[in-house]
Amino acid sequence: MRSITSSKRVCAHCLSRSRLFSTTVQHRAQPSSNAVPSSPPRSGYARLTNRGLISITGVDSTTFLQGLITQNMLIANDPRRATRRTGTYTAFLNSQGRVLNDAFIYPMPKGDSETDTTGDPAWLVEVDKNEVSSLLKHLKKHKLRSKLKLRALEDGERTVWSSWKDHAEPRWAAYNLESESSSPFAPSSSVAGCIDTRAPGFGSRLVTPGEEDLRVHLPDEAQVAGSQVDLGTYTVRRMLHGIAEGQAEIIRESALPLECNMDMMRGVDFRKGCYVGQELTIRTHHTGVVRKRIVPVQLYANSAPQSGDTPVYDPSAAVALPPSGSNISKVDGRKGRSAGKFLGGVGNIGLALCRLEIMTDIVLTGEGSHYSPEQEFKISWSAPEEGSSSATEPGEVKVKALVPPWLRDYISSGARNLARKVDNQEGHRAKELLYQLEEEEEQRRNE
């Protein structure tokens, strides 16, 4: 078995610096494989064959991306980041503020023939491999007269990696903070990358030229530790940390960035100027309450799992995996609105979009919570309709939503800030009412 634990709580102050899903759901059967992914090692790296790359080069490439993504591309205005050549986590939204694609964006490494001759800004956009053509179409639609070139990289041109060292992560990486030291990705390096800020201590994201092993480019044990693992093992580690990735889990044109925890993951800059989809995102951040979020879930058949805040992966567990998009409901409960939606999983763990005040003990507002520790939840699904290509068998499994410590701290800090904001607003209204009553009393005296 493999579980992730956190001995330290994330500082809420540090983290603070940094329409719901459609009811029409296409059930997608989980991919079947005879090989069960192994538990992730404490140190290792994985070749991410499910990710694709798009190059954007040209004098207007930076401002072009600035108007399309949730992250701030104009790092030259920030003295702490101006000298750094690191990538960043971000998202492309549609005009309604829903996610088109989650992505990483990296400065083009030196030695690239497309940029070395011109010296113009150039970027690599990493995205779900199945979504490269869709994102490229979206970019071309917004290109207009911008002076830039767009190109999807061929397989083998560059390779995307995830690398981690659970026992030796720098404190600034473990807490989703940027190091004050110089970037490990030097301007002269052929390797692009960044600290993966989607969960504390999750590791680094790297892009290397060609198809060679990561150690060919980074032979130093201090940079890359452990052995290479397969994509399935990386997926297990990602889900244990509660990280959704790609449009199989972050549903295109349906998911909202804050429900996908992109605010906690430092994928949204709430101080930047206009970009596509900004209005709903900013309004929700400043005035709304995010009642649903993606969290890791534990799947089980009979006995409830032990209490904890992170799931435990058991490769030998005999648990049926529900189809993606399946509704979560209360066990022995009346039919009503769904408590959440299952997004995907591996073995006995997965990810789900959950209503926090129903499936967890998180309290978001002063209205109180509907959560009960004794209440169990289930996912039930029927056989696909006749003629469907899906081979999913009908079944049912119980599910428990878990909130990792870093996400709990972030949500709690937001709830406290909201409560203080409401108290301040009520205080201002009370003062205004008092002044109004005093003025009316003064007028009556003068009559």
From Swiss-Prot:
Question: Which Gene Ontology terms describe the biological processes this protein takes part in?
Answer: iron-sulfur cluster assembly
Pfam entry (one)? Beta-barrel_CAF17_C
Q: Respond yes or no to whether keyword Metal-binding is given for this record.
A: no
For this UniProt record, the keywords arranged alphabetically read as follows: Mitochondrion, Transit peptide
Q: Which InterPro entries match?
A: TrmE/GcvT_dom1, YgfZ/GcvT, YgfZ/GcvT_CS
Provide ranges: composition bias, Polar residues. Answer: 25-37
Q: Output a single Gene Ontology CC term carried by this record.
A: mitochondrial matrix
Molecular function in Gene Ontology: transferase activity
Q: Where in the cell is it found?
A: Mitochondrion matrix
This one is known as Iron-sulfur cluster assembly factor IBA57 homolog, mitochondrial
Organelle transit peptide residues = 1-28
Similarity comment text for this entry:
Belongs to the GcvT family. CAF17/IBA57 subfamily.
- Gene3D superfamilies assigned to the protein according to its UniProt record, in alphabetical order: Probable tRNA modification gtpase trme, domain 1
Region: Disordered, residue numbers: 25-44
Q: Which organism is it from?
A: Aspergillus fumigatus (strain ATCC MYA-4609 / CBS 101355 / FGSC A1100 / Af293) (Neosartorya fumigata)
